[in-house]
Amino acid sequence: MGTNDRVRTTPERIRLPESGECGAKKAERIPIEGRSKAQRATEIIQELIGQFSLATLLEILDLSRSTYYYQVKRLAAQEDQDMALKELIQSIYDEHHGNYGYRRIHLELRNRGFIVNHKKIQRLMKRLGLKARIRRKRKYSSYRGEIGKKADNLINRQFSASKPYEKCYTDVTEFALAEGKLYLSPVLDGYNSEIIDFTVSRSPDLKQVQSMLEKAFPAKSYSGTILHSDQGWQYQHQSYHHFLENKGIRPSMSRKGNSPDNGMMESFFGILKSEMFYGLETSYQSLDELEQAIADYIFYYNNKRIKTKLKGLSPVQYRTKSFG
């Protein structure tokens, strides 16, 4: 079968002969989607020009030589226009250590005054080979059975709050290096996902949690505040409940072995570890270095890392904009 015998195709699909054959076998189908047919056809030709002759590709795609060269010039001009945008996308991606996908880069560009379609951001990131990191899950549990006082689940997975300090969340997570382990105990505000305060310790003891409470809740009274946790032994301890009672804070606990009940903390720990720990463990030379990196990340998370659910703002920006 010669080239002239091939059936011309609709704008939706094209049919190409297999390399080195006359097209007797079933040919690969390639979709022509988006933008103009001539522009997309030109892009396909540029992708396949090393495998087939230009004349063959032009005939199969029903594209004149003059139109092809015109589109090549247009694409080159468009590439020049996109160069500055690609450099900015790369800069944002690098600034956030490869943790931003196209959605958050789109929001960050909007915050900087650039109005660009999110699909274009996605397309340019693909060309640049930029992909956001995938989160890994590894759960640390401090549960040691029913050894103290428990509390009802007052949250029931209704995590969001209408104002700061209405619903707060806490938990402990573990970081393991060859030298030893660190334990992070933060308090997160359900209003804007801000880390109110935190402690880092070499051991997950009661002193760490007591210090965390004192740092996160320094005022005399917090009437109307709920502090939700899992059923870890620290949160069943009498001193924990005594502190909350004195501050007017109501305790709330997840059901036994049900980590999604504390989804706000689970989400934060997942973000934290995927963005500054998993895959980077060997880069930390000591526990002191890791501890400083955790503190630096939490500052970054609160003040710079934008969240889609906060309208493209960081937790502190969202709180400041809402309450001044």
Descriptions of predicted regions:
Residues 2-324:
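Charged DNA-binding/catalytic regions of mobile-element recombinases
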